[in-house]
Regions:
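Conserved N-terminal phosphate-binding loop of PLP-dependent enzymes in the Aspartate aminotransferase
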Residues: 1-206
Length: 206
């Protein structure tokens, strides 16, 4: 893909120049794969940040990296939520579930996301709607343009200003709450029945 090609070039360039490649995987970490976006695109960063999924709903943030970098210099960092026992225990259980594949099934999440996007896009194209479902793995978004977009700048350029907020309000009228950022993050709790109901509501609104 274009993204994978870009990341590979970025990895090569950073290596040649002696610059650390840092991935922000706060959103994508443990969502796109057990190694996040780095695993999905088969790129090894030097440092990576994690959050959200890692805490299983509790506040958390973590930094990981290659051993020789992490051991270069020890840093003391204190904060209100630092090393919170409940968050740490939740993270332990999450990591165990990912490593042992006891609960989180990435192939199932990927299939759910792809089905969501394919079915909606087929509907939008069939009915000549300037709307598309985009995303990667279990991360999805509805965009109100049929133009190809690669980033936030493209979306802001092609998508009507109030489209997302109006759409979210309409979904709430159908008892569907979408996060303020407009992203649909599917989890193992979202059954096929729940996703089909979501697809049906989106079709009715659009």
């Amino acid at each position: 893909s274009d993204v994978k090609e870009f990341l590979n070039k970025l990895r090569d360039h950073c290596t040649k120049k002696g610059v650390l490649l840092i991935f922000d995987e706060i959103m994508t970490g443990f969502r796109l794969s057990s190694r996040g976006g780095a695993g999905l695109f088969q790129i090894t960063p030097d440092l990576v940040t994690y959050g959200k999924v890692l805490g299983g709903g509790f506040p958390i943030g973590a930094v990981g990296g290659k051993k020789h970098i992490m051991e270069t210099k020890h840093v003391f960092y204190g904060g209100t939520f630092s090393a919170n026992p409940l968050s740490m225990y939740a993270a332990k259980l999450i990591l165990e579930a990912i490593i042992n594949e006891t609960y989180i099934k990435y192939d199932q999440l990927d299939t759910a996301g792809q089905t969501f996007r394919d079915e909606l896009n087929n509907y939008f194209i069939l009915h000549d709607k300037k709307i598309r479902a985009i995303g990667c793995g279990s991360i999805n978004r509805i965009i109100f343009t049929d133009r190809f977009i690669m980033n936030r700048k493209d979306r802001d350029l092609y998508e009507p200003t109030n489209a997302q907020s109006m759409f979210s309000e309409s979904l709430r009228d159908h008892n569907v709450f979408v996060n303020g950022n407009g992203l649909y993050h599917f989890s193992m709790s979202h059954t096929s029945e729940v996703i089909r109901k979501l697809i049906g509501n989106i079709k009715r609104i659009c």
